[in-house]
């Protein structure tokens, strides 16, 4: 079990919700990216959405390299949230709306996530704003879900702006307040985002960042 028990519970409930509702594991358009999460002996090169289930990592993924690169100490929850499992993005319902929580699909995806996190933190520094790190997005407009690096609280954040609406005092509390959303996988057509990027959620975040840089 990770140091975020609510995440362990959510991941278990997520799988069960799909099994109970659809009679199968959740599906994900992996875009030819191999992962330990893939269920069954299938061709990863397929264009079809693949069934998946979360996998506990043998060695916890850590963000020490990000801390070293930025000379910044990150809140410990970042390692527990991103480094304890491999999984696809997690769709949720909540009192604040529907959205997705980001997870690492594989080790290569985890490393790509670290690079995106460096970009986000560098942007915050450039804007002279307090450091935050993202965990997901809401479906409503351009609202990111970010963690305040100083105290671990969870907020709504619009790209280019400081955190605006506090959602929970801690990441564990926030995850406890959201519930799995059973929905078909969405295959996004990526015209300007490289194929190796994390499907879907990365596209949305990068569009937000690019719009900001263009201002």
UniProtKB/Swiss-Prot annotation:
Indicate how the chain sits in the lipid bilayer.
Answer: Peripheral membrane protein
Can you cite an annotated GO cellular component?
Answer: cytoplasmic side of plasma membrane
The record's keywords, sorted A to Z, are: Cell inner membrane, Cell membrane, Membrane
Subcellular location(s) of the protein:
Cell inner membrane
| Entries under CDD domains matching the protein | Syd
Query: Which protein family is it in?
Result: Belongs to the Syd family.
The task this protein performs is described as: Interacts with the SecY protein in vivo. May bind preferentially to an uncomplexed state of SecY, thus functioning either as a chelating agent for excess SecY in the cell or as a regulatory factor that negatively controls the translocase function.
In Swiss-Prot or TrEMBL terms, this protein is called: Protein Syd
Could you tell me which species this protein originates from?
A: Shewanella piezotolerans (strain WP3 / JCM 13877)
């Amino acid at each position: 079990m990770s140091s975020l028990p609510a995440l362990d519970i959510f991941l278990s409930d997520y799988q069960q919700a799909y099994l109970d509702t659809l009679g199968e594991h959740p599906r994900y358009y992996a875009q030819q990216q191999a992962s330990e999460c893939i269920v069954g002996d299938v061709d990863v090169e397929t264009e079809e959405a693949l069934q998946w289930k979360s996998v506990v990592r043998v060695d916890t993924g850590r963000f020490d390299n990000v801390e070293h690169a930025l000379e910044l100490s990150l809140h410990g929850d970042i390692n527990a949230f991103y480094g304890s499992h491999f999984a696809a993005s997690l769709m949720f319902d909540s009192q604040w709306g529907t959205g997705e929580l980001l997870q690492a699909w594989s080790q290569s995806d985890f490393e790509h996530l670290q690079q995106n996190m460096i970009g986000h933190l560098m942007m915050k520094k450039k804007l002279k704003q307090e450091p935050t790190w993202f965990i997901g997005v809401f479906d409503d407009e351009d609202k990111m879900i970010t963690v305040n690096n100083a105290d671990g609280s969870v907020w709504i954040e619009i790209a280019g702006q400081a955190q605006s609406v506090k959602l929970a005092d801690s990441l564990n509390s926030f995850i406890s307040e959201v519930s799995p959303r059973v929905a078909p996988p969405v295959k996004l057509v990526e015209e300007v985002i490289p194929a190796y990027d994390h499907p879907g959620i990365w596209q949305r975040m990068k569009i937000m960042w690019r719009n900001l840089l263009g201002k």
